[in-house]
Regions:
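Gly/Gly-Pro- and Ser/Thr-rich, intrinsically disordered tail segments characteristic of DNA damage-repair
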Residues: 1-218, 228-233, 268, 392-452, ...
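Short, charged/polar surface micro-motifs in flexible loops or helix N-caps
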Residues: 8, 32-33, 287-290, 376-379
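Short, hydrophobic beta-strand segments
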Residues: 100-106, 293-296, 378, 383-388
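Short Gly/Ser/Thr- and Asp/Glu-enriched loop/turn motifs at secondary-structure junctions
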Residues: 95-99, 138-141, 275-279, 364-368
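DNA-contacting surface of Y-family translesion DNA polymerases
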Residues: 2, 175, 183-327, 337-339, ...
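Non-catalytic surface loops within mature trypsin-like serine protease
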Residues: 106, 139, 286, 300, ...
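Acidic, metal-coordinating catalytic segment for phosphate/diphosphate chemistry
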Residues: 300-332, 337-344, 349-351, 355-457, ...
């Protein structure tokens, strides 16, 4: 069974503010570069959708109600709904703050059938929270997710055994999980427009020249075959944070402070889960939407801010040194219109890294920065030798004290001088304290769910439909159960 909480953030805003009921509600970053996190179905009638620039949404729906995300509240309601689902089954695989798979094999015998079971769960959620959800029941995860999306909002669709291919046959190939615009274009060029066209093939061999190693998965899903189990205990492979800036960054010191901020947030998230990361990567987007990334594997897995920060600076400077005269050729460009580029001379800024690493100015305005830590595990790293620097031990003790203080007095109660400068100094990104808290909340909201990258500046919360289609960051079941609806 797949459960999706319809227009979750917007629905909570309408629930908490009855005067919003029946009106278009748009939740997201409210700056000129903000992005829609989600919107009510009333807003969708105007063409507004998740991941749309807020400026575009305001043109389409000028009379809409625009709301800044309240992540504490959304997570509170999400926890309540997940608790309700646990009343029906202990086998739950969270996909995000508002979406999950439930293993309900055999449970339909306790009701008059699968549809009655789905109705019971939906009614229970509405009774306890006042919110509607959509549910899909099917023999496997792919079909269950597809079913939950067929009759939104407040949908309840059952795909019984034996009718998998019949239901899928008339649907476009873009409904296959993992088929994006590029793969869709390739398949269509090969004559495959609907799932029935793929179903007509005896096996995946005809697809291999088109999509390579994706062929078997695409053929199986088009035929309703999906053996993935519900994973009740999943390993998070990566965490990340990125921010789109209302004003482009052009100063090396400001960029340094941003990496310090990201490293601080990610290290805390790792320590809360007792995880260590093996790989650090940075993402850079210029004002013309040229985007490039670099990564480095650590000698020893870490959960420390200074390690992530220093590695980010090393990657940044390496990127700058590689491309001192022009933007990266290998970078992909978004389809958004290009902006003017202002070239500036490289200069060095002394950064606050304990290793004295210098931070270089960018070759042009920076629209977005991101930092990701991946290759996560629960292994506690050992010192390589007795002669290692005592810095890590000192940092561990300091981090433990700061974590304890923040758990008692809040995320923004204790702040290093560098982070204070980030929010209040001349080179930093000024924000009100309430905005800082919202940014922190947005970044940590899904720590108990799927691994996500959260844009703590403009997007605030990743689009849930996008998260559901990017499960590369989640790997390996720890506990699995066989499905037999």
């Amino acid at each position: 069974m797949h459960v999706d909480m319809d227009a979750f953030f917007a629905s909570i805003e309408q629930l908490d503010h009855p005067e919003y009921k029946g009106h278009p509600v748009i939740v997201g970053g409210l700056s000129s570069r903000g992005v829609v996190a989600t919107c009510s179905y009333e807003a969708r009638k105007f063409g507004v959708h998740s991941a749309m620039p807020i400026s575009r949404a305001k043109k389409l729906c000028p009379d809409g109600i625009y709301v800044y995300p309240r992540m504490d509240r959304y997570k509170e309601v999400s926890n309540q709904i997940f608790s309700i689902m646990k009343e029906f089954t202990p086998y739950i695989e969270p996909l995000s703050i508002d979406e999950a798979f439930l293993e309900v094999s055999g449970m339909s015998t306790m009701y008059s059938g699968p549809k009655a079971l789905g109705r019971a769960i939906k009614d229970r959620v509405f009774e306890k929270t006042g919110l509607i959800i959509s549910a899909g029941l099917a023999p496997n995860k792919f079909l269950a997710k597809l079913a939950s999306d067929l009759d939104k909002p407040d949908g309840l669709v059952v795909i019984p055994y034996g009718r998998e291919k019949e239901v899928l046959a008339p649907l476009p190939i873009k409904r296959i999980w993992g088929v994006g615009p590029r793969t869709e274009k390739i398949l269509k060029a090969g004559g495959f427009h609907l799932m029935r066209h793929i179903q007509s093939l005896p096996d995946e061999s005809s697809l291999i020249p088109l999509v390579g190693n994706q062929a078997k998965r695409i053929w199986e899903l088009a035929n309703g075959i999906d053996d993935r189990p519900v994973e009740t205990d999943r390993k998070i492979q990566s965490i990340g944070a990125e921010e789109t800036y209302e004003e482009d960054l052009t100063d090396g010191r400001a960029i340094e402070l941003e990496f310090r901020y990201f490293a601080n947030r990610l290290s805390k998230r790792l320590r809360r889960r007792s995880l260590h990361g093996h790989t650090v990567s940075i993402k850079v987007r210029y004002d013309d939407f040229t985007t490039v990334s670099r990564q480095k594997r650590l000698d020893t897995p870490s959960d420390q801010e200074h390690v992530f920060f220093e590695t980010a600076l090393i990657l940044w400077n390496k990127l700058m040194q590689d491309k001192t005269s022009k933007r990266p050729k290998e970078s992909k460009k978004d389809t958004e219109p290009l902006g003017a580029t202002t070239k500036v001379k490289f200069t060095n800024f002394k950064c606050s890294s304990s290793k004295g690493i210098t931070c270089m100015d960018p070759p042009g305005p920076i629209r977005l920065l991101g930092l990701t830590v991946s290759g996560l595990d629960e292994e506690v790293p050992m010192q390589d030798s007795l002669f290692d620097s005592p810095q890590d031990e000192t940092e561990d003790k300091l981090a433990s004290v700061l974590d304890s203080l923040e758990s008692k007095f809040g995320e923004t109660a204790v702040m290093s001088g560098a982070l204070w400068q980030r929010f209040h100094g001349d080179n930093g990104i000024r924000r009100k304290r309430s905005e800082l808290k919202a940014a922190v909340d947005a970044q940590t909201a899904q720590d108990d769910g799927a691994s996500t990258k959260v844009d703590v500046g403009s997007t605030k919360e990743a689009n849930q439909s996008i998260i559901a289609d990017t499960h590369a960051s989640i790997e390996g079941p720890k506990k699995t159960v066989k499905k037999d609806l």
